[in-house]
Amino acid sequence: MCIRDSIRKAYDKTGDLSVCPMITGSGGLTLAKHLEVPFVQEVIAVSTALTHYAPQTDVAIELGGEDAKIIYFEGGNVEQRMNGICAGGTGSFIDQMASLIQTDATGLNEYAKSYKAIYPIAARCGVFAKTDIQPLINEGATREDLSASIFQAVVNQTISGLACGKPIKGHVAFLGGPLHFLSELKSAFIRTLNLDDEHTIVPENSHLFAAIGSALNLSLIHISEPTRHLRI
């Protein structure tokens, strides 16, 4: 239904055109095989999108719902570091922490705009983070400070857990849903990495860069005839 609905919306805007769906992202390979749709590795998709829209990028930080990535671009080489085993420091972690202070991710973002202090919170695991947050709640820490501390924990986990000492410098792009929709999370990264405006890259539709890149990769895939027709 998702593909059919997307094609229907595209048809309403563009008229009768031949289209080819592409799939990327975590878990996408199995779905692509089932639907007989071309699959593009996510790091390739993101790299392609950055090449087109932000070619000056030296490092890309991408946060998703279940994983986090740092991608280094060095002299034509691409190195990806990914946290795909545990959801600590990702969008789902943020949702879990938000529920502890009876709000959602958007609420965290609004609270964090007025923080006064940052508390140390572990983002490596939701269980450990809860043991850090609950005493702070009991001691009367404000939601504003807790929200900013949760975002800072995500920043620390990403930098220490993925970069592992490798410098994040040059022009840094921020991608993925959490960094697109949560301005204070992005600000925490920028503040921690000491980035100025010149070296901070926030592309338009940054939450869709993997999808954009997968579409741009269509030209690299040979498709002779449509494998399936969808009635819309």
Model-derived features: positions:
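Single conserved hydrophobic/aromatic residue that forms the stacking wall/gate
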Residues: 1-3, 221-232
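Active-site nucleophile and cofactor-binding loops and adjacent substrate-binding regions
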Residues: 22-23, 37-47, 61-65, 81-89, ...
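Adenine-nucleotide phosphate-binding core of ATP-dependent small-molecule kinases
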Residues: 129-160
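N-terminal glycine/serine-rich phosphate-binding loop of ATP-dependent small-molecule kinases
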Residues: 4-42, 187-204
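Conserved phosphate-binding catalytic cores of ATP/NTP-utilizing and phosphoryl-transfer enzymes
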Residues: 27-79, 159, 163-164, 211-217
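Glycine-rich phosphate-binding loops at beta-strand->alpha-helix junctions
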Residues: 26-27, 163-192, 203-207
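Glycine-rich phosphate-binding loop plus the immediately following alpha-helix
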Residues: 75-117, 216
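Glycine-rich phosphate-binding/hydrolytic loop that grips phosphoryl groups
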Residues: 94-96, 202-220, 224
